[in-house]
Amino acid sequence: IANPHALTLTHIMPDHLSIHAAREDDMAEITGVLLSSFGHMPVEQAMGNVDTPEGRKAMRERHLQAWREHAKETDVPCGIKCVHTDPTSGKETIVGFSEWFIYANPPMPEHHEQANALISGTWVPEEGGQREKVQAALKPTIDTRRKWLHGRKCAVLMYVCVDPAWRRQGAATMCVQWGVRKCNELGIMAFLEATEEGQHVYKKCGFVEVEKVRCDWEGEVGVFPAMICWPRGTREEDRTPAILSS
């Protein structure tokens, strides 16, 4: 969803990289970057995020639908792309991508009790218990978000990915920093679950670990730290879950 106002937030950095709001017609290119980072994960594969023509098409449509739903709540862009502009030819290539779901208006208390469309798994076939299996694997993620975000203004960083040829050159940091700056402007918290590869980027951008999310897939447990970047001025006593354990 392109937001003309968001383009004024473009940040230029060395090596001809810049940040822009992603457009719907960017999604075909972005899908390739997403698959290069997450396509190896069994749960992503089980959800149909696979590198086939049919898988790519379905994946694009799911993300675009999530963008459209998000656009009903805010004019802040959801998809953020990092673009390399060739200094000789002027050709632009999407080398990185992040997906920020920003909820700057006070949500209903139950807002985060339902899964974001991209992790609901409702499209997974029911045959053989596949949907139930996927949703069970994702439940710890959904429960942790509910615990920390219930009723709060916040932003959820769903995906950060970089083309393999462009990793460790600042693209991921730029994508994350864009959202952190926006959250600071709005005075809201930013939340994510980190992969092992991404943790150092998030820490550098101000995120701190609040707990570990453990997801089980066919007996193999993956651990993904839940991390929060609190807005400036947040009191220590307020840096607690929205829903406290009884």
Regions found by a protein language model. Give the residues of each.
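A short beta-loop-alpha structural element at the N-terminal edge
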Residues: 18-32, 43
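Conserved GNAT-fold acetyl-CoA-binding loop/helix
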Residues: 40-65
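A short helix-loop-beta-strand connector motif used in the catalytic cores of GNAT acetyltransferases and
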Residues: 58-85, 105-108, 129-133, 150-156
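Conserved acyl-donor/pantetheine-binding loop and adjacent beta-alpha core of acyl/acetyltransferases
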Residues: 89-161, 167, 215-222, 234-246
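A structural microfeature
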Residues: 94-96, 172, 211
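Conserved GNAT acetyl-CoA-binding A-motif
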Residues: 153-155, 182-194
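Conserved acetyl-CoA-binding loop-helix of GNAT-fold acetyltransferases
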Residues: 162, 168-181, 204
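Conserved acetyl-CoA-binding loop of GNAT-fold acetyltransferases
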Residues: 205-212
